[in-house]
Amino acid sequence: QAHTYRTLFPAMIKNWRKKWGTEFPFYWVQLANYMAADSLPAESTWAELREAQTMALSLSKTGQALAIDIGNPNDIHPRNKQEVGRRLSLIALHNDYGHTDLVYSGPQFRSMQIEGNKAILSFDHAESGLIAIERYGYLRGFAIAGADGKFVWAKAKIDGDKVVVWSDQIANPVAVRYNWGNNPDGTLYNAEGLPAVPFRTDDWKGITQ
């Protein structure tokens, strides 16, 4: 019921704040990577739930720590609690303890521009630069589609503070997805070592609607 979570999750936060009588900070951990990896781009209930969690950031005094890169395909609960805690602490230090110089989030999709067969992506929380972590040394995790909505794995490269995405199979791209799956393996981070937030540029009907 990931699509319903778009409504239920922020409603819960608002309800708890109402009952406590104060707009207290509310931070959470996004769903970690889990289960088998997809050999081809596919729809994913877990990806849709992660999207619903990210949407709740529209509420004031909220924050989200990612665990998309530290999960276990056979264990729903990531064992690396230290890194989860560290990422949550960055949010609290930035928002609540005056350390406004700290970068507390990985790159978050802002906008897309189409130029020929390429999609040019811009991000927030990437002021210090974008990197592909050394697991592969190149960008993974991107998929691209034309108007027919059929996604294929895409090539991607960092160009300054942007990411350029394309595929020789898609002449006229209209949508890009990143780390959209149950157990994706994307490699886009900011210079501070925080993973990019999974996203999609389309609003096509999901499998939980």
Segments and roles (model prediction):
Residues Q1-Q209:
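Catalytic-domain carbohydrate-binding cleft regions of carbohydrate-active enzymes
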